[in-house]
């Protein structure tokens, strides 16, 4: 049976930590920042950890990183 391929789109957007959790950049900071609150901009600055159901979905697309 051939090796499973990793989805390139998922590989570019998600990082797996040493403990197996998935980090992703917070959404909503591409354009239209005038109408966003300062609190929203501040909170979206860093990365966030995906929830368990979302992590399960990402694992299917990155078979060799867990």
UniProtKB/Swiss-Prot annotation:
InterPro entries: Ribosomal_bL35 (IPR001706), Ribosomal_bL35-like (IPR021137), Ribosomal_bL35_CS (IPR018265), Ribosomal_bL35_sf (IPR037229). One of its GO terms (biological process) is translation. One of its GO terms (molecular function) is structural constituent of ribosome. Keywords: Ribonucleoprotein, Ribosomal protein. It comes from the Bacteria. One of its GO terms (cellular component) is cytosolic large ribosomal subunit. Belongs to the bacterial ribosomal protein bL35 family. This is Large ribosomal subunit protein bL35. It comes from Chelativorans sp. (strain BNC1).
